[in-house]
Amino acid sequence: MFNIIKNDKNSNARLGILELPHGNVATPCFMPVGTLGVMKALKHDVLEKLGCDLMLANTYHLYLRPGIDVIKKYGNLHNFTTWNKNFLTDSGGFQVFSLSNFRKIEDEGVDFKSHIDGSRHYFTPESVFSMQETFESDIIMALDICSPYGIDYDEASLYTNITTSWARRTLCAYKNRKEGYEGLLFLITQGNFFKDLRKRSTELILELNSPGIAIGGISVGEPRDRYLEILEYNSSLIPKDKPKYVMGIGTPHYILDAIYNGIDIFDCVNPTRIARHGSLLTDNGILRINRAEFCFDTCSVERECSCTLCTRYSRGYLRHLFKSEEALGVMLASEHNIHYMFRLINKTKNAIMNDNFVKFRKLYLDKYDEGNLNE
């Protein structure tokens, strides 16, 4: 199911193989986010050529549109979308709980209003698992409560307890899954930014012995030093034989921090989100193509990059596409940024294989500061 093939000698970084129903996934792995089963501005064949083996889709959004009955008619999410690689489906918990003025949390589940039309809906751990079972997701995420940064201890403790209770119920549903379904369940540790809650949550989740473990509730607006503190602490509590997933991180410096601490999987909308606004990831930092300085620039965005944009088009032409609001500009920039993330991961894998990851990370972080990487 998960095999570690190389441990870095100077950090907790490692190389692994995660065996999933639609093919093996080499870790560390950056997961592009295809919320509705599709990447914004990227066709499946482009993703496949880039080497994507695992895409994230979102249960909350798919539940609302097109609806579970539509996907069931096609047999599963893979058939509906024609994506023949792996899907990880988020439980939708983050989206539901971000609707703070439109939801009510109970021990049984959560009542919420649709962001589309205001209609009321109710999610339980069992119903969310059932939806993902219908999708035949390759990785299923349990329903959890992602509590915001800055809440008090009592509220964080309450949400952590509910998350643990929901994890037990999800595991029970998973053990009674339909015959032949081989997707892997990842349970989620919470605890906000209180170490004793993190420890309690992780210990209780580990007792349930799910195939994989996710660290939730970090990278939610906290300072980077707090992120690093909880990331390192929570990861250290999880046995090394478990695949580890940190949810919602996707900037290069956060990913390198995660890999350093033994994290195997991560996802974020950031690369394609900033691409849609004309910001491109390069080895020299973010290039903002809308700036006037690029109007007459005949160079490619990045010389060493082999994506469609960099092998064919100039910076000046890409700027023209964005200024003219041509869809091709967004498509090219999105492909470039995803390709960049995959290239970064491949460089990271080579560094781990050669026990050179610590040096590689330091050189990268010395070159890129946090402000330079955020839009």
UniProtKB/Swiss-Prot annotation:
<dbReference type="InterPro" id="IPR004803">
    <property type="entry name" value="TGT"/>
</dbReference>
<keyword id="KW-0671">Queuosine biosynthesis</keyword>
<feature type="binding site">
    <location>
        <position position="310"/>
    </location>
    <ligand>
        <name>Zn(2+)</name>
    </ligand>
</feature>
<comment type="subunit">
    <text>Homodimer. Within each dimer, one monomer is responsible for RNA recognition and catalysis, while the other monomer binds to the replacement base PreQ1.</text>
</comment>
<comment type="similarity">
    <text>Belongs to the queuine tRNA-ribosyltransferase family.</text>
</comment>
<feature type="region of interest" description="RNA binding; important for wobble base 34 recognition">
    <location>
        <begin position="272"/>
        <end position="276"/>
    </location>
</feature>
<dbReference type="GO" id="GO:0008616">
    <property type="term" value="P:queuosine biosynthetic process"/>
</dbReference>
<dbReference type="GO" id="GO:0101030">
    <property type="term" value="P:tRNA-guanine transglycosylation"/>
</dbReference>
<feature type="binding site">
    <location>
        <position position="144"/>
    </location>
    <ligand>
        <name>substrate</name>
    </ligand>
</feature>
<feature type="active site" description="Nucleophile">
    <location>
        <position position="267"/>
    </location>
</feature>
<dbReference type="GO" id="GO:0005829">
    <property type="term" value="C:cytosol"/>
</dbReference>
<comment type="function">
    <text>Catalyzes the base-exchange of a guanine (G) residue with the queuine precursor 7-aminomethyl-7-deazaguanine (PreQ1) at position 34 (anticodon wobble position) in tRNAs with GU(N) anticodons (tRNA-Asp, -Asn, -His and -Tyr). Catalysis occurs through a double-displacement mechanism. The nucleophile active site attacks the C1' of nucleotide 34 to detach the guanine base from the RNA, forming a covalent enzyme-RNA intermediate. The proton acceptor active site deprotonates the incoming PreQ1, allowing a nucleophilic attack on the C1' of the ribose to form the product.</text>
</comment>
<keyword id="KW-0808">Transferase</keyword>
<dbReference type="InterPro" id="IPR036511">
    <property type="entry name" value="TGT-like_sf"/>
</dbReference>
<feature type="binding site">
    <location>
        <position position="336"/>
    </location>
    <ligand>
        <name>Zn(2+)</name>
    </ligand>
</feature>
<feature type="region of interest" description="RNA binding">
    <location>
        <begin position="248"/>
        <end position="254"/>
    </location>
</feature>
<feature type="binding site">
    <location>
        <position position="305"/>
    </location>
    <ligand>
        <name>Zn(2+)</name>
    </ligand>
</feature>
<protein>
    <recommendedName>
        <fullName>Queuine tRNA-ribosyltransferase</fullName>
        <ecNumber>2.4.2.29</ecNumber>
    </recommendedName>
</protein>
<keyword id="KW-0862">Zinc</keyword>
<dbReference type="InterPro" id="IPR002616">
    <property type="entry name" value="tRNA_ribo_trans-like"/>
</dbReference>
<feature type="binding site">
    <location>
        <begin position="90"/>
        <end position="94"/>
    </location>
    <ligand>
        <name>substrate</name>
    </ligand>
</feature>
<dbReference type="InterPro" id="IPR050076">
    <property type="entry name" value="ArchSynthase1/Queuine_TRR"/>
</dbReference>
<keyword id="KW-0479">Metal-binding</keyword>
<comment type="pathway">
    <text>tRNA modification; tRNA-queuosine biosynthesis.</text>
</comment>
<feature type="binding site">
    <location>
        <position position="307"/>
    </location>
    <ligand>
        <name>Zn(2+)</name>
    </ligand>
</feature>
<dbReference type="GO" id="GO:0008479">
    <property type="term" value="F:tRNA-guanosine(34) queuine transglycosylase activity"/>
</dbReference>
<dbReference type="GO" id="GO:0046872">
    <property type="term" value="F:metal ion binding"/>
</dbReference>
<keyword id="KW-0819">tRNA processing</keyword>
<feature type="active site" description="Proton acceptor">
    <location>
        <position position="90"/>
    </location>
</feature>
<feature type="binding site">
    <location>
        <position position="190"/>
    </location>
    <ligand>
        <name>substrate</name>
    </ligand>
</feature>
<keyword id="KW-0328">Glycosyltransferase</keyword>
<dbReference type="GO" id="GO:0002099">
    <property type="term" value="P:tRNA wobble guanine modification"/>
</dbReference>
<dbReference type="Pfam" id="PF01702">
    <property type="entry name" value="TGT"/>
</dbReference>
<feature type="binding site">
    <location>
        <position position="217"/>
    </location>
    <ligand>
        <name>substrate</name>
    </ligand>
</feature>
